[in-house]
Amino acid sequence: MTTSRRKAREIVLQALYEQDLAGHNAEDVLKRLLTENPQTEENVEFIFRLTNAVVKHKDLLDENIRQFASAWPVEQLSYIDRNVLRLAIFEIIHENDVPVKVAINEAVELAKSFGGNSSARFINGVLSSVSKALADTANQREE
């Protein structure tokens, strides 16, 4: 069963994918997708906020991908994998109300639904590295 937030993330991913692949304006894509897939007011706010934040911070998110998936140039990742990572890394770093494990699980589920055969495993590995690095940084600050 698809949760309400999972469906919202699917819509965010679709908008990011279409913007990345075809250069369409993400907000215009969202408006079309939300006409086709009506959401609660709360989800609409979540969808626009998350999409706009990922678009705004794309370069920084890509730097994180380069750091934690150094064997894979960002430009060579599939459009789906690249945007699942952008979305999840943003949530892990900036969305304090979303537990890290939930953000990783949601990203893996998106990868299973929309990505290639090895996407879920790849996404899980990269995001686990991001999570570990953040935990290590937090532990260093506490010491």
UniProtKB/Swiss-Prot annotation:
Stated role: Involved in transcription antitermination. Required for transcription of ribosomal RNA (rRNA) genes. Binds specifically to the boxA antiterminator sequence of the ribosomal RNA (rrn) operons.
UniProt GO MF annotations: RNA binding
Gene3D superfamilies according to UniProt: NusB-like
GO cellular component: cytosol
Entry's Gene Ontology BP terms: DNA-templated transcription termination; transcription antitermination
Keywords, alphabetical: RNA-binding, Transcription, Transcription antitermination, Transcription regulation
Disulfide cross-links: none
Native organism: Dehalococcoides mccartyi (strain ATCC BAA-2100 / JCM 16839 / KCTC 5957 / BAV1)
Pfam family, one: NusB
NCBIfam families documented for this protein: nusB
Family of this protein: Belongs to the NusB family.
Keyword RNA-binding: yes
Record protein name field: Transcription antitermination protein NusB
